[in-house]
Amino acid sequence: MKQSKVFIPTRRDVPAEAEALSHQLLLKAGLIKQSTSGIYSYLPLASRVLNNISKIIREEMESIDAVEILMPALQQAELWEESGRWGAYGPELMRLKDRNGREFALGPTHEEVVTSIVRDELKSYKQLPLTLFQIQSKFRDEKRPRFGLLRGREFIMKDAYSFHADEASLDETYQDMYNAYDRIFKRVGINARPVVADSGAIGGNHTHEFMALSEIGEDTIVYSEHSDYAANIEKAEVVYHPNEKHTEVAELEKVETPNVKTAQELADFLNRPVDEIVKSMIFKIDGEFIMFLIRGHHELNDVKVKAFFETDNVEMATQEEIVNLLGANPGSLGPVHDKDIRIFADNYVRDLNNLVVGANEDGSHYINANLDRDFKVDEFGDFRFILEGETLSDGSGEAKFAEGIEVGQVFKLGTKYSEAMNATFLDNQGKAKPLIMGCYGIGVSRTLSAIVEQNNDENGIIWPKSVTPFDLHLITINPKKDEQLELGDQLYKELQQQYDVLYDDRKDRAGVKFNDADLIGLPIRIVVGKNASEGIVEVKVRQTGESEEVHINDLNTHIATLYSNL
């Protein structure tokens, strides 16, 4: 394709709001154009890359007998009400009404729709298992869209859904999909690591995320340098190692702590280590107010709280609710009180004598508060985030942290949706049973961004050959010179027989062409310049920067060798 005929609006400036490197490069290289916050148009180069990513996904889905369909983006509210997610999903669900007042959602996911399709058609265990997938746009009303394609309000996803008669069948498909995802990310050129994860709003009891390692990643991965252990920090278990209490129990004493709001401020004010401070927090869980205690240098993990109580109905109590309950504001709360509130504490609170806790009076704290003497804990558990350097649950050593971009996730849904929506089949005994489900997603547009995030240098993008918008970038330095134009046209005609070629026939300066070529980042560049009359061109590999002068008689062989080694 001739570059003079392709819409590639490259730019030299970077918008101030473009924080992520991938966002900057996709804008500068002319791949995307922002319509409004979190919404982008995919320009010709991006469209070609997305097609290549989708082609790889389709090949891998077909290899495990997944069948492609296309479902509506516009979903009626009644389906979401059946599953219980219409009220539970939250403000991220984009809702609208038609002219008759009927409510709809722009789908962020398609569990309800696909379940409604199969419940009318799958009647017997003989029709199972079945896996359906689609590639289409999704919608999510993000509070703060950021990082370009990494967190947008409209995005492209591949989502798949599997239906089974038993858990063994689900396990098999789950593993097939897990392996297919691993192959997909390797093929598109992403260093992605599968990690144990939380299922979030989709639900289910078993899930893995595929995380593309990146400094800009919004998720923290906990991993081992000595084993295959990897987990999202929300799911990483904290191993409890009891420590003996060596200090003598002292008398409970109330002290004034004016204008102290945080655990660190309190530690500084009292000249105590922050890990001897105990933070008290009030949550509302299924309508019940519950106090949680954790040490001052730890952070409460609400995902673990939800898992412990087996409910998603978990929220922080409001300031008004806390004041009505305990008579003090957050920052002055503590377990020493006579209120009928259950108290749960992180395991590592057990190790402390003479705790510093809030006195349930603004500007006051207790020192030397002790478990059992001054307050009771209903139950201990793992309620916090792991710290880097702590022992991993698989015994392989210390926890290491890395940042990652979630590019895919696989879920075992079980019967959550089939039971709610009455999707049943007849087993081999003629008994009606709910379909057992799995769901599996890949962020296609997010994968595009993650590829750029991991494959670049100071000059621009470096496309992996599997997804590159074009294989070769053919450039004539000065098309006004007949020998260059003629050789360029000749090579363009010949190379198109084997490769996708972007032919820069523009009448711009050589520097502009070279800068654009580096920015766009096609794997191999062929430059027709001053030696055109001798049949010699320069061939440059974008990834390594290595270049070599090659006679056109040897060009096909040379390019084939280079391409096979990319």
From Swiss-Prot:
Main location: cytoplasm
Gene3D superfamilies listed in its UniProt record: Anticodon-binding domain, Bira Bifunctional Protein, Domain 2
Keywords: Aminoacyl-tRNA synthetase, ATP-binding, Cytoplasm, Ligase, Nucleotide-binding, Protein biosynthesis
Subcellular localization, as worded in the UniProt entry: Cytoplasm
Biological processes, Gene Ontology terms: prolyl-tRNA aminoacylation
Superkingdom of origin: Bacteria
E.C. code: 6.1.1.15
Catalytic activity, reaction form: tRNA(Pro) + L-proline + ATP = L-prolyl-tRNA(Pro) + AMP + diphosphate
Pfam families, alphabetized: HGTP_anticodon (PF03129), tRNA-synt_2b (PF00587), tRNA_edit (PF04073)
Gene Ontology cellular component list: cytosol
Any one GO MF annotation of this record: proline-tRNA ligase activity
Family designation: Belongs to the class-II aminoacyl-tRNA synthetase family. ProS type 1 subfamily.
Domain description: Consists of three domains: the N-terminal catalytic domain, the editing domain and the C-terminal anticodon-binding domain.
Main function: Catalyzes the attachment of proline to tRNA(Pro) in a two-step reaction: proline is first activated by ATP to form Pro-AMP and then transferred to the acceptor end of tRNA(Pro). As ProRS can inadvertently accommodate and process non-cognate amino acids such as alanine and cysteine, to avoid such errors it has two additional distinct editing activities against alanine. One activity is designated as 'pretransfer' editing and involves the tRNA(Pro)-independent hydrolysis of activated Ala-AMP.
Subunit structure and binding partners: Homodimer.
Protein name: Proline--tRNA ligase
Source organism: Staphylococcus haemolyticus (strain JCSC1435)
Classification lineage: Bacteria, Bacillati, Bacillota, Bacilli, Bacillales
